[in-house]
Amino acid sequence: MSELPDLSQIAPTLKAEILAEALPYIRQYHGKTVVIKYGGNAMTEERLKQGFARDVILLKLVGINPVIVHGGGPQIDQALKKIGKQGTFIQGMRVTDEETMEVVEWVLGGEVQQDIVTLINHFGGHAVGLTGKDGGLIHARKMLMPDRDNPGQYVDIGQVGEVEAINPAVVKALQDDAFIPVISPIGFGEDGLSYNINADLVAGKLAVVLNAEKLVMMTNIPGVMDKEGNLLTDLSAREIDGLFADGTISGGMLPKISSALDAAKSGVRSVHIIDGRIEHSVLLEILTEQPFGTMIRSH
């Protein structure tokens, strides 16, 4: 895995060059919102967790408004295992019965979210955690999963939702008060139920509603890969349709790429899928010229 060098070991002139390279990007994104889908190894390895917290604080300090939407699949799996329950997935979505939903709410809205918030605040930032149920943020509806074996039929995957609507007022209020919002992807339905929503889908929809300048999705691979394992650095809507059709994009990448493409088509100017295993990957993507990950284009 590639890593950034320790800044303490870099010559002063090179440090200056790095800062100078970042300047035009700081100007470009100053005052703008950047939505970051945070997940994968970056959420579990201590070095990466600390690096991410510092990176988010730096973005805020230079006038960029980061909004974090986090996942937590591995943590949910561990919690389910403790109660003797195994996670099941259909087309990249977690089957969520009532018992699983209780675990999801506790893990995402409690353990995982508070870990992120605490770390950011520990390093001097000002983060506030909330779920989609707070402030009426995410209105959800039950997801109807098409049955691929029976056209026209649907598979019941429980309390799995999709975004019906987003009310960004609470997020904007936090941004106005210089806080960093950290959002757990749990929505509420008109039926009074809580819904587990894929974090990629929430991040994409939120980026559109907030008129974000950029959407960054962190994952455990370099980006979107072809069948030979080569990184695809730039993908158009037509190319993505082809990758869906031939099965190159499958499993957990399905909702990620679908959400990224929808965001690009809906006006988010820059959409990237990046390797969260690389330290400071968010800063590399936002504040440098270095080509990184996969760019998703709407045309």
Swiss-Prot record:
Keywords: Amino-acid biosynthesis, Arginine biosynthesis, ATP-binding, Cytoplasm, Kinase, Nucleotide-binding, Transferase. Gene3D superfamilies: Acetylglutamate kinase-like. SUPFAM superfamilies: Carbamate kinase-like. It catalyses: N-acetyl-L-glutamate + ATP = N-acetyl-L-glutamyl 5-phosphate + ADP. The record marks K37, K256 as: Transition state stabilizer. One of its GO terms (molecular function) is acetylglutamate kinase activity. Pathway: Amino-acid biosynthesis; L-arginine biosynthesis; N(2)-acetyl-L-ornithine from L-glutamate: step 2/4. Its EC number is 2.7.2.8. One of its GO terms (biological process) is L-arginine biosynthetic process. Signal peptide: none annotated. GO terms for cellular component: cytoplasm. It is found in: Cytoplasm. Coiled coil: none annotated. Its main location: cytoplasm. Substrate binds at G72, G73, R94, N196. CDD domains: AAK_NAGK-C (cd04250). InterPro entries: AceGlu_kinase-like_sf, AcgluKinase_fam, ArgB, Asp/Glu/Uridylate_kinase, NAGK-C. Belongs to the acetylglutamate kinase family. ArgB subfamily. Catalyzes the ATP-dependent phosphorylation of N-acetyl-L-glutamate. PANTHER family: N-ACETYLGLUTAMATE SYNTHASE, N-ACETYLGLUTAMATE SYNTHASE, MITOCHONDRIAL. This is Acetylglutamate kinase.
